[in-house]
Amino acid sequence: MAAPAKRRRAAGPDPDPTAGFVAWCEAAGVELSPKVSISRRGTVSGYGLLAAADLEPGELLFSVPRSALLSQHTCAIRALLHDAQESLQSQSVWVPLLLALLHEYTTGTSRWRPYFSLWQDFSSLDHPMFWPEEERVRLLQGTGIPEAVDKDLANIQLEYSSIILPFMKSHPDIFDPELHTLELYKQLVAFVMAYSFQEPLEEEDEDEKGPNPPMMVPVADILNHVANHNASLEYAPTCLRMVTTQPISKGQEIFNTYGQMANWQLLHMYGFAEPYPGNTNDTADIQMVTVRKAALQRAKNEAQQQLVAEQWDFLCQLEMVGEEGAFVLGWDEVLTEEELSVTLKVLCMSEEEFKEYKEQDGWEDDSEEEENSTLSNAALSRLKAPCKALLYDSVLLTLESYRSDLRAEQDLLSKQVYEKLSRREQQALHVRYGQKRILHQLLELVQ
């Protein structure tokens, strides 16, 4: 998602850094089609790529040589990062790239300076991690984003203090903790979240290797995202290529895809969400422990509550549920279909049925397993009555976790009210509304 232009670090700001960036692209070997233009006008947000002429499917928009990519393998301190790779290992695998960015972004002679000029001040990134905590909770309670941000901030603090800071102190000729601060590091984490690319592994490597490290791809990261995108990035041995996937008329914006992302993921990682009904990949979550809570509330006596506890423990052993897990609901089906199907079935068993099920170690005959594994909307409406009731109660409990109901959200979407909302309020509204629509759709299916 392209961000607004920002303040330059050194000399006065360039009112239009685009020309300098395009010149840099040409010098770096980036091939930009004459049928496209980089612009801040006519885009959904910040910089974007516009069609300067009609485009057909399969047309090359640009190609970026691998030598122009900014990564731990191409930066000025690549040898240093290679030698220290064991000490730079982290859960996120982002640390080497972040160190490369810390160095290149604050070095006036960096070969990527014209690239950074498009993002002159990362403080204008508007991910929820930069919102005041009170605002984050008020606008996003129930969406899953506040919890994800809390984890991010804790990991950023830990990574900076335990890996980044010791590395910088051991290389004082390159890094300065007073310049390369935690705040800058946090901004660069958001920059990598929003703009980096990870090359997919070859199929034969998927089981043996971890994910490829992220990298920055000039020009490719300018494209904005929509679920119904019209361009796609291709990875070739010597370059990365952006190619059209459908006809695009002159003047239209060209969109890439960041993958099948729900609105809460888009806002969390990229700082924006798609208005309803644009995001066909949107989802809503029911926390697994919420289903347990609903089952316990339905228990009529202590013996039934004990049975629910035993059933839950068995589901944990089967790795169908976990204390921090969630069942994921899409517009047309349950994405965690096996987990939800088995959980509903087990929690609705009588004591005798559960005893027999345990003796079979959770196995069932193929026909029964196949019948219960696919939870499309049609299949949800055909669930047995006890499973429907348990799922219905679980949805009601989930809806209670938000601060407002669906009707209140619909009132906010009226044009006169919506236009008066702040950008953050609008983006949060898109997330909440999509989730609640999916949950209410499920209520109707199992009512």
UniProtKB/Swiss-Prot annotation:
Key words, A-Z: Methyltransferase, Nucleus, S-adenosyl-L-methionine, Transferase
Positions of the SET domain: 34-259
Keyword check for Transcription regulation: no
Intrachain disulfide bonds: none
Domain of life: Eukaryota
Protein name: N-lysine methyltransferase SETD6
Function, as annotated: Protein-lysine N-methyltransferase.
Species of provenance: Gallus gallus (Chicken)
